[in-house]
Structure formats: C-alpha cells, structure tokens
UniProtKB/Swiss-Prot annotation:
GO biological process terms, semicolon-separated: D-amino acid catabolic process
Protein name: D-aminoacyl-tRNA deacylase
Gene responsible for this protein: dtd
Catalysed transformations (reactions): glycyl-tRNA(Ala) + H2O = tRNA(Ala) + glycine + H(+); a D-aminoacyl-tRNA + H2O = a tRNA + a D-alpha-amino acid + H(+)
One Gene Ontology molecular-function label: tRNA binding
Pfam families assigned: Tyr_Deacylase
Organism: Streptococcus mutans serotype c (strain ATCC 700610 / UA159)
Length: 148
C-alpha cells in the first residue's frame, strides 16, 4: 500500500457534482493498493495512521495523533500512486492492484480504520473532486512495503 497522508483543517469530496463527504480537522488519505498487498499491510497502515503524532500540542510540538485530537479522516482511493513514469510521457498504472482486489482491500482498510476514527470515503473507481485546506502543510508518504 502507498498512502499519502495530509493534515487538514477541513476537506470535502464531490462525485458527479454532488457532495459525497466532508470532514473538519483531521487527515485526508490518498490510498493506493498494490497487487501484493494483504491484510497485514492494512493493519500496519491503520496502526501507523491512527497513532502518528503529527498534530500540535499546546506547546506547538507535533505530539498528538488524529485520535488524540478526535479528528476525522477522508479516505480516497488512488491507484495513480502506483504510476510508472519511466518510459514515455504517459504514465502506466500496471503496478496497481486489479480493481476487484483493490476495491475489497480498500473497503477492508476503511472498516478497520473506522474502529478508531470517524471515516468518510469517496466512491472506489469514480472520478472525484477533492477540496482541502492543508494544515502546515504536513504531507507524509506511507509505504507498507518499506517498513525499515
């Protein structure tokens, strides 16, 4: 899994011009599923995301997690995180998981995440518009295949 984690003040998502989801302070997650991803990747990612101390405490130090601040999460499926740009000018997305596996694992990821924080989602495979107000900005890339 490759996940872009963005700390936000607020975010919203629309599909086909209709509002689908919105959150206040919390995290926007752009979630890419790879062909070799398994349940252990989901569990690892959920643990990291929900406990990552990237929100400021009363002294201005990044010392609080999204759980600590009672924040929310907007989770957006993002197969383009597996783009291969080595050849030519058009990215290839063959490094992403097939849609059926990716959809299943994305749903499982969101269900597991929702055990710890409120989660809003987009619609898997849809063309979506995401609006957000970055906070910091703080943007982190989590790759479950690179745990060292």
């Amino acid at each position: 899994m490759k996940i872009v984690i963005q700390r936000v003040m607020k975010a919203s998502l629309t599909v086909n011009g209709k509002s689908r989801a919105s959150i206040n302070q919390g995290l926007v997650l752009l979630v890419g599923i790879g062909p070799d991803d398994v349940q252990e990747d989901l569990t690892y990612a959920v643990r990291k995301i929900t406990n990552m101390r990237i929100f400021s405490d009363e002294e201005g130090k990044m010392n609080l997690s999204v759980r600590d601040i009672k924040g929310e999460v907007l989770s957006v499926s993002q197969f383009t995180l597996f783009a291969n740009t080595k050849k030519g000018n058009r990215p290839a997305f063959t490094g992403a998981a097939q849609a059926d596996l990716a959809s299943y694992l994305y749903d499982q990821f969101n269900q597991e995440l929702a055990q710890f924080v409120p989660v809003q989602t987009g619609i898997f495979g849809s063309d979506m518009q995401v609006s957000l107000t970055n906070d910091g900005p703080v943007t982190i890339l989590l790759d479950t295949k690179n745990k060292e």
